Regions:
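Alpha-helical substrate-recognition element adjacent to the catalytic core
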Residues: 2-130
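Short, flexible hinge/linker loops that cap or flank conserved catalytic cores
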Residues: 1-2, 170
């Protein structure tokens, strides 16, 4: 009987990466006050809701302070990954399964970060906002054009659940395993079936409330068809998968 691969899908910011990927970029600013982050964040939260547009404005402000594209790309390469990521990726690859990253960051950032740590080779595909222009400054387009209006969990520029549906409908997998942390990962978890697994970030010792866990546990638990598993580091994810004889 044919042995089907497992599809592993990871969020990037604060899932694979320790911090949100915007922080090392914004820290490049010689004068952070001149980034006008209050105005930029207001536009994101109250006007357009598109993360790529927010970052385009940050890149523009950085360019006005003399930060060039190569400095931005070097910042992408310094993004710290969650402990255990390398070992987990290698084990998934050795077992002939598939790794997909779905992220509201941008494709270039994720590629450069993973390439710098020799992990890009294990990733089958990255679904994220595409970089349209590198010079004189990096400009990121929306992943979805026209903007999506069907999903209220996800931002208009990228719906993670619809991407999961596309993979499920176009390929055959033994199961789908999704790992995330934020509110825009709820949609992805709710698209999973009974045989799949959803991993939500949770740290009982931290004061941080991780939205994926909080929303799924307290508001959408009855709509969740799959088992909800908790993680703090990628080592936790790896250990759980081994205990379940998935890896």
């Amino acid at each position: 009987m044919e042995k089907l691969p497992i599809l592993f899908i990871f969020d990037f910011d604060e899932t694979l990466s320790v911090r949100a990927s915007c922080y090392p970029i914004e820290e490049l600013a010689p004068n952070k006050e001149k980034l006008n982050l209050d105005d930029i964040n207001h536009g994101y939260v109250h006007v357009h809701h598109c993360w790529n547009r927010r970052m385009n404005e940050v890149h523009k402000q950085l360019a006005e302070q003399g930060i060039n594209t190569e400095q931005l790309i070097e910042a992408f390469r310094t993004i710290e990954l969650n402990p255990g990521t390398a070992e987990l990726f290698r084990d998934i690859h050795i077992n002939n399964h598939k790794i997909i990253i779905i992220s509201n960051a941008c494709d270039l950032l994720i590629e450069e970060c993973l390439r710098a740590q020799n992990l890009l080779q294990y990733v089958d595909e990255i679904k994220s906002n595409p970089v349209r222009q590198r010079e004189p400054l990096i400009i990121i387009d929306e992943y979805e054009n026209p903007l999506q209006t069907n999903c209220t969990f996800c931002q208009p520029n990228l719906c993670k659940g619809s991407i999961i549906d596309q993979y499920r409908n176009s390929n055959r997998y033994d199961k789908i395993i999704f790992v995330g942390d934020g509110d825009n990962d709820v949609c992805a978890a709710l698209r999973l079936d009974k045989a799949d697994y959803a991993f939500a970030k949770y740290d009982e010792e931290s004061e941080t409330t991780y939205k994926m866990y909080d929303l799924l546990k307290n508001q959408y638990f009855k709509q969740l068809k799959t088992e909800l598993l908790l993680w703090k580091t990628m080592k936790d994810v790896h250990d759980i998968l081994k205990k379940k004889n998935i890896l």
